[in-house]
Amino acid sequence: MNLIAAVDKNWAIGCKNKLLVSIPADMKFFRETTTGKVVVMGRKTLESFPNGQPLKKRVNIVLTHDKNFKAGDAIIVHSIEELREELKKYPSEDIYVIGGETIYKQLLDDCDVAHITKIDYAFEADAYFPNLDEMPEWKITQDSEEQTYFDLEYYFVKYEKQVQ
């Protein structure tokens, strides 16, 4: 399974249920990487999308404790166990965990690849991604050249979990 996220220099991912910054090249990378695949998210992540609707051209799976929650054609699950059962229907390499903070932490151990856009700036934030640089089992296997968006510098980095 894969994780995909944009993080700042403190591994922050959001503030007040919004992304820290919207970088067009990062959004394009996200679209190209996840289109036609399975995306897994929490309810608050889904609600942060335009009109709170599932992403087009993807299988959307939403984890929520709210038994009455519905969202378009999204598949709704209510526990990690139910989510893991649902995910067995899909090839692991086609599954992308897209947030937010709680879902990333809950599914980190199930994943073996992380596509991280690292932004060289510290934003005000209240949601964080686990710091993969502090986890010896996660190694950088690809690192892009420095990219810029106005005065922000960022990199596309691929981490892979090493089998211990």
Q: Which positions does each model-derived feature cover?
A:
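Enzymes that bind and transform nitrogen-containing heteroaromatic metabolites
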Residues: M1-Q164
